[in-house]
């Protein structure tokens, strides 16, 4: 292993592929602590819809970046990177191996590589002007604000749902600040690794994965997803950005009497399958992953392959 960079293990893969189970085995074998790389598991009281690991499933392995925010608090790749970097230092200092587990690709990418966004620094006067314009736009409805965005950045408008007011506003703010379109913005990324990273991924055939996703949704509903979402709505979180996540946005209309549970269930399964497909495409296009086939390999064989890869780094 490289001596000048901390060693970390990163485990990626689509939703429902079995990352949680394998991560526990990895942590047991390599004296690891797990950092969640999931954009939703940071939120308290959003357990069932995020398939959050339970205390029993943790098997005594320390887990970080879970239940750290209220549902109405913002969270971003930038915030994740800052917190994860500190945790990696702490875990390494304890003589343990940081194991980052997640399906949010941008979070993983931002942590592994030097990754930053274009500078948006502007003068104080310009900043005040932008804020004044935004304050006026804040009077618009979601649909009106979305239409305003579409008037100059149609691509971003197509990519962002009208109800995702935060992202719509952000795209407008970026344009007002820079006179550039958010859709044409290029992220500045230097492919310099911040860590000595063993990047693993779990995969399986699409048919089997989709079956697992459908089953997982059924289990979520049996475990009380409807009650969880109802409680969040009653607590005033219905319009929070976190409630736009898959697993929640499909159930809110049921709570409000707009659609049936059967219709919501079908939507949730479809959205989850679509998300899994996007995840796999992203991981395979953006990251250099050592893929482990869960259908062809037992957990034991997967662990053996990890041992081989670690041994190679030591020689």
Curated annotation (Swiss-Prot):
Record-listed E.C. numbers: 2.5.1.75
Instruction: Tell me the superkingdom of the source.
Output: Bacteria
Q: Which cofactor does it need?
A: Mg(2+)
User: What EC class does the entry list?
Assistant: transferase
Gene3D superfamilies assigned to the protein according to its UniProt record, in alphabetical order? 1.10.20.140, P-loop containing nucleotide triphosphate hydrolases (3.40.50.300)
What's an example of a GO molecular-function annotation for this chain?
ATP binding
Give binding positions for substrate: 15-20
Listed GO biological process terms: tRNA modification
Which keywords accompany this UniProt record?
ATP-binding, Magnesium, Nucleotide-binding, Transferase, tRNA processing
Q: Cross-referenced PANTHER family, in alphabetical order?
A: TRNA DIMETHYLALLYLTRANSFERASE
Subunit note: Monomer.
HAMAP family for this protein: IPP_trans
Q: Identify this protein by name.
A: tRNA dimethylallyltransferase
The source organism is Staphylococcus saprophyticus subsp. saprophyticus (strain ATCC 15305 / DSM 20229 / NCIMB 8711 / NCTC 7292 / S-41)
**Native organism taxonomy:** Bacteria, Bacillati, Bacillota, Bacilli, Bacillales
Gene from which the chain derives: miaA
């Amino acid at each position: 292993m490289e001596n000048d960079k901390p060693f970390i293990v990163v485990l990626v893969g689509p939703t429902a592929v079995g990352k949680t189970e394998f991560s526990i085995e990895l942590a047991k074998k390599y004296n690891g602590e797990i950092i969640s790389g999931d954009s939703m598991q940071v939120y308290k009281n959003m357990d069932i819809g995020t398939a959050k690991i339970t205390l029993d499933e943790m098997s005594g392995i320390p887990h970080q970046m879970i239940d750290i925010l209220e549902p109405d608090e913002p969270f971003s790749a930038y915030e994740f990177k800052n917190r994860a970097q500190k945790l990696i230092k702490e875990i390494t200092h304890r003589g343990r191996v940081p194991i980052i587990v997640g399906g949010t690709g941008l979070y993983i990418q931002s942590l592994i590589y030097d990754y930053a966004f274009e500078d948006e620094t502007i003068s104080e006067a310009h900043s005040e002007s932008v804020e004044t314009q935004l304050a006026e736009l804040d009077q618009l409805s979601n649909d009106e604000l979305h239409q305003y965005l579409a008037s100059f950045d149609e691509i971003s408008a197509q990519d962002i749902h009208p109800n995702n007011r935060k992202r719509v506003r952000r795209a407008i703010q970026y344009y007002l600040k820079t006179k550039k379109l958010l859709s044409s913005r290029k992220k500045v990324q230097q492919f310099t690794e911040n860590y000595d990273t063993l990047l693993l991924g779990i995969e399986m055939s699409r048919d089997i994965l989709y079956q697992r996703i459908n089953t997982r949704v059924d289990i979520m509903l049996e475990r009380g997803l409807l009650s969880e979402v109802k409680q969040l709505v009653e607590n005033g979180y219905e319009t929070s950005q976190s409630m736009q996540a898959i697993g929640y946005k499909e159930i809110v209309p049921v709570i409000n009497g707009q659609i049936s549970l059967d219709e919501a269930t079908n939507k949730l399964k479809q959205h989850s399958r679509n998300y899994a497909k996007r995840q796999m495409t992203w991981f395979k296009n953006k990251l250099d992953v050592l893929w482990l086939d869960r259908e062809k390999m037992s957990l034991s064989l997967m662990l053996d392959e990890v041992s081989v890869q670690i041994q190679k780094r030591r020689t």
